[in-house]
């Protein structure tokens, strides 16, 4: 029992010291708490932000690609198409008619209708559709429309089979 009393006394003395330490530690713990809190928050936010970020990036990329890249791609496509068309025309039968018609068409439509036809036929119909349906109606709905269209389209085939 005497031993217990001694332990208690020691504990009491220690408790006082511990209390002081605890108070000091508490400050550290409080400081650590906010630091630890942002970690999971950032993690969660990162995971949640990953989706919208990807959406925004895709939208920005699409926008830039649609304005700058599309023009460049369309120019290159037209050049390739023109070269191929010209070569094929030379080998074909109505080269003169084709050449004249193409020249007149290009000059008349200022490479607008011809390009549209070429772009619509050469690459997938996704770019022209997105360009027409996405860019014209609303700029803000462009980033929200692709994911919405992608999700239902991906879910539909999964649900059907």
From Swiss-Prot:
Highest taxon in the source lineage: Eukaryota
Record membrane topology: Multi-pass membrane protein
Entry annotated with the keyword Transferase: no
Residues covered by the TM2 domain: 52-100
InterPro entries in the record: TM2 (IPR007829), TM2D1-3-like (IPR050932)
Topology Cytoplasmic: residue spans: 1-24, 76-80
GO CC field: membrane
Transmembrane regions listed in the UniProt entry: 25-45, 55-75, 81-101
Pfam families: TM2 (PF05154)
Entry's localization field: Membrane
Keywords: Membrane, Transmembrane, Transmembrane helix
Extracellular side: 46-54, 102-161
Region (Disordered): 139-161
Protein family per UniProt: Belongs to the TM2 family.
Name of the protein in question: TM2 domain-containing protein DDB_G0278163
């Amino acid at each position: 029992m005497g031993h217990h009393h001694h332990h208690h006394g020691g504990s009491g003395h220690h408790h006082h010291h511990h209390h002081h330490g605890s108070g000091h530690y508490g400050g550290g713990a409080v400081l650590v708490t906010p630091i630890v809190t942002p970690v999971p928050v950032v993690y969660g936010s990162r995971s949640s932000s990953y989706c919208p970020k990807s959406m925004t990036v895709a939208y920005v990329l699409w926008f830039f690609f649609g304005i700058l890249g599309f023009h460049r791609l369309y120019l290159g496509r037209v050049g390739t198409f023109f070269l191929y068309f010209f070569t094929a025309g030379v080998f074909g039968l109505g080269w003169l008619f084709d050449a004249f018609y193409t020249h007149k068409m290009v000059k008349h439509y200022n490479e607008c209708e011809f390009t549209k036809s070429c772009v619509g036929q050469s690459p997938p119909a996704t770019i022209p559709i997105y360009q027409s349906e996405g860019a014209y109606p609303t700029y803000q709905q462009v980033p929200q429309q692709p994911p919405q269209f992608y999700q239902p389209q991906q879910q539909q085939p999964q649900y059907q089979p």
